[in-house]
Regions:
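Terminal targeting signals and extreme-terminal segments of soluble enzymes
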Residues: 1-264
Length: 264
């Protein structure tokens, strides 16, 4: 079985065209959105090797099937000296399962700098290992006595987890960005369910249909996914069959690396 990091290895039969495979997440067959984001980021980075990925906006109009290969197409909308914008489509045959716009740019020196401090949640060594969330090569520890799968455990619409990928290749910015996208897609629905007794993550893809609709992700800094990062999620709104929230990924030093916003 592929690991998440192995799934980032795309083949390229022609310029702007890539092929990939999927990993199985949970008991269902839909392709996981975090995996698709990583593969989209890898394809975009490979198409403009002189630049780094800065932001991603992605939609998931249809569910993919993990048993079928993925076809990833990159269309360069603009390429300049310091910035490039690409559209990235993911298909399985005639089925269009994802569409993204990716901004790439070059590194610049600081003009001004500030970032929010790391939330006071304790060190990762103090957090509880989350075996049910640690899959495909990741290590995840959840802050507090939180069980996102338990329909009867009620709490605020937020969750914080420490995440690291021990086998992530240090110094490989494209791959570290891509694998870091994985868990930005994984926690918000569970956070949104927490205030509501009788609803929990264990119901997903069984008695309750869940899935990502849109996701926006920005990379502020280079970072190594092999190091611990704190991922915080705040589900600000739930209603009309949708959830909206934001998240932030920060190093242990407090440097914000990746904010994201998602709609389900």
């Amino acid at each position: 079985m592929l690991t998440a990091i192995q799934a980032l290895e795309l083949t390229s039969p022609a310029a702007g065209e890539f092929r990939g495979e999927s990993v199985l997440v949970g008991d269902g067959r839909p392709v996981f959105g975090g995996q698709l984001m990583g593969q989209v980021l890898m394809a975009a980075a490979a198409s403009h090797g002189d630049k780094v990925v800065r932001s991603l906006q992605i939609m998931f109009p249809r569910a993919g099937d993990v048993a079928r290969p993925l076809e990833v197409s990159v269309d360069t909308l603009h390429s300049g000296r310091t910035m490039a914008t690409v559209g990235v489509a993911v298909r399985q045959g005639q089925r269009h399962i994802s569409q993204a716009t990716v901004l790439l740019d070059t590194e610049e020196e600081d003009v001004i700098r500030h970032a929010p401090p790391l939330p006071a949640v304790g060190d990762p060594e103090q957090a509880k290992p989350a075996e049910n969330l640690s899959h495909h090569g990741a290590e995840v520890r959840i802050v507090g006595n939180v069980d996102l799968g338990d329909p009867e455990q009620v709490g605020p619409p937020e969750v914080a987890v420490w995440v690291r990928w021990p086998d992530a290749p240090r110094g490989d910015r494209a791959r570290n960005h891509a694998i870091s996208a994985w868990y930005t897609d994984n926690m918000l629905i569970g956070a949104a369910m927490r205030p509501h007794a009788g609803v929990g993550g264990s119901m997903a893809h069984a008695s309750l249909s869940t899935g990502v609709v849109t996701h926006t992700l920005t990379f502020h800094e280079a970072s190594d996914a092999a190091d611990w990062h704190l991922l915080t999620n705040d589900a600000a709104y739930a209603g009309r069959g949708r959830v909206y929230g934001t998240g932030r990924s920060s190093r242990r030093t407090g440097l914000s690396c990746r904010p994201s916003a998602r709609t389900r």
